From Swiss-Prot:
Designated name of the protein: Ubiquinone biosynthesis O-methyltransferase
UniProt keyword annotation of Membrane present: no
Any Pfam family: Methyltransf_23
GO biological process: methylation
Length: 242
């Protein structure tokens, strides 16, 4: 096993970037490949807004923003939002959609580690949704998010647990049976157990506040948040006050 960590500037999996570049033009198609993201976005936004005590007037960073679905919705809540992504095409789509929607979001193509080196403790809220399982060194991303948030600020992560059920649900079910997302979107080896994520959080100024599962019911075709983190889950952390 290679124990070398990717350099700060290269914590990027170009195969992962290519996957999303290929379908970027359909990011805002409510019936396309990103339909699940559109479906779960109200749940994500509601969780972030409630746990943060509202977003109005706050400075927010969305790490791995893609085409801007969450970033735009947080801007609509009155936040000043910056979106980071390493995919050129998704960012172009995000910028164009924000322009067409009259929503102001600043989008930047750089890694979160690079951003942290220049903007430490600058954000009230940092979000990192469905991104950790797509990079070579997710631990480095967690550390960078911790560096970017202000003392007392909130950091949110969401990812997929690594076990047999998550493989069946997120890979076999979502990609091959229900065809909710393109085949090859996920690699179960890159999924992250909650204990692993929490161990990385514990290495920083962040402290766990709450964890919840994101559940899909194929019979009713609905999503909900609730107990149980065996497949998708969201974690709310808070930075220690100075």
């Amino acid at each position: 096993m290679n124990t070398e960590k990717p350099s700060v500037a290269h914590n990027v999996d170009h195969n992962e970037i290519a996957k999303f570049e290929a379908v970027a033009s359909r990011w805002w198609d409510l019936e396309g490949e990103f339909k699940p993201l559109h479906r779960i976005n109200p749940l994500r936004l509601g969780y972030i807004t409630e746990r943060s005590g509202g977003l109005f007037g706050k400075k927010v960073l969305d790490v791995g923003c893609g085409g801007g679905i969450l970033a735009e919705s947080m801007a609509r809540e009155g936040a000043t939002v910056t979106g980071l992504d390493m995919g050129f095409e998704p960012l172009q789509v995000a910028k164009l959609h924000a322009l067409e929607s009259g929503i102001e979001v600043e989008y930047m193509q750089e890694t979160v580690e690079e951003h942290a080196a220049k903007h430490a403790q600058q954000y009230d809220v940092v979000t990192c949704m469905e991104m950790l399982e797509h990079v070579p060194d997710p631990q480095s991303v967690v550390h960078a998010c911790a560096q970017l948030v202000k003392p007392g600020g909130e950091v949110f992560f969401s990812t997929l647990n690594r076990n047999g059920k998550s493989w069946l649900m997120a890979v076999v079910g979502a990609e091959y049976i229900l065809r909710m997302v393109p085949k090859g979107t996920h690699d179960v080896k890159k999924f992250i157990k909650p204990a692993e994520l929490l161990s990385w959080v514990d290495e920083t100024v962040l402290k766990e506040q709450h964890i919840t599962g994101l559940h899909y019911n194929p019979i009713t075709n609905t999503f909900k948040l609730g107990p149980g983190v065996d497949v998708n889950y969201m974690l709310h952390t808070r930075a220690k006050k100075a």
